[in-house]
Amino acid sequence: MTTTLEEQLSDKLQMMDETTDKVQGSSKQKDDSSIAASSDAKTASPSSSDSSTKVAAPESEFYNKAQKYWSEVPATVNGMLGGLGYISAIDIQGSNVFLREIRVPGNRLALDCGAGIGRVTRNLLIPRFSCVDLVEQDPAFADKAREYCTSEDGSRGKVGQIYNVGLQKFTPTQQYDLVWTQWVLGHLTDRDLVSFFRRIKQGLAPGAFLCLKENVSSSKKTVEDRNDSSVTRPLDSYEHFLKEAGFRIVRKVKQQNFPKGLFPVYMIACKPVSKE
């Protein structure tokens, strides 16, 4: 993964009490391999709300600890979602509605960042695109993803490259119609997050979208999870970092119908300021 996670949501969802949003020991979601800055990842650069990520440990330790955490997680949907595998269908439904609303102009090639075992690739991206590339840092997840995403006849031949690298080191070499990151950006330092956004900008086809789906803190503070070495940022931090990297936000929607007690989850679609 890099991810983040996808994170992912990459996107690893864990119950937390709404009243403990300020408590730094609280858990958080991650998805499809929110693996330390691999396929679901995290970043630097102070935001206007003074919510910049404060990584107590050295940067290498921050990433290594997250990588170790995800290496011990089962390569299953339930593992990717922190024991909350039952929310996968609701999550995919919300993402499908979001993509219909923004009307991605092309259907040739998509990129799943922090892909984990490919939950988002299989259920959201493969039905929409001719080919999907994945970025996933964890080797076991990457191996499982190719199997999981090609187990149905309609998906054969639709999985392209699987980049086994962290998002903090990933540079796209293709032009994508859509780049999707989910539950992984919390595994990047602020500095690496902005740098990742800037590199992704160079890998977007004309009119293409970068989409984020991430947990956000309910307060203006960044919440640190030392267990998996990640952070949950306020929504305005993502807005600030996207602007700093040269993106404009086209649409922003809160995911509905998730169980109570989880962090709010937002989807953000954006385009480079210099591209239409």
From Swiss-Prot:
Alphabetized SUPFAM superfamilies for the sequence: S-adenosyl-L-methionine-dependent methyltransferases
Positions with biased composition (Low complexity): 34-57
Record: residues binding S-adenosyl-L-methionine: 114, 119, 136-138, 167-168, 182
Domain of life from the UniProt record: Eukaryota
One Pfam family recorded for the sequence: Methyltransf_PK
Enzyme class: transferase
Molecular function terms, GO-annotated: histone methyltransferase activity; N-terminal protein N-methyltransferase activity
Recorded GO CC terms: cytoplasm; nucleus
UniProt keyword annotations, A-Z: Methyltransferase, S-adenosyl-L-methionine, Transferase
CDD domains attached to this UniProt entry: AdoMet_MTases
Disulphide bond pairs: none
Its job: Alpha-N-methyltransferase that methylates the N-terminus of target proteins containing the N-terminal motif [Ala/Pro/Ser]-Pro-Lys when the initiator Met is cleaved. Specifically catalyzes mono-, di- or tri-methylation of exposed alpha-amino group of Ala or Ser residue in the [Ala/Ser]-Pro-Lys motif and mono- or di-methylation of Pro in the Pro-Pro-Lys motif.
Family assignment from sequence similarity: Belongs to the methyltransferase superfamily. NTM1 family.
Record protein name field: Alpha N-terminal protein methyltransferase 1
Organism for this UniProt entry: Drosophila melanogaster
Organism classification: Eukaryota, Metazoa, Ecdysozoa, Arthropoda, Hexapoda
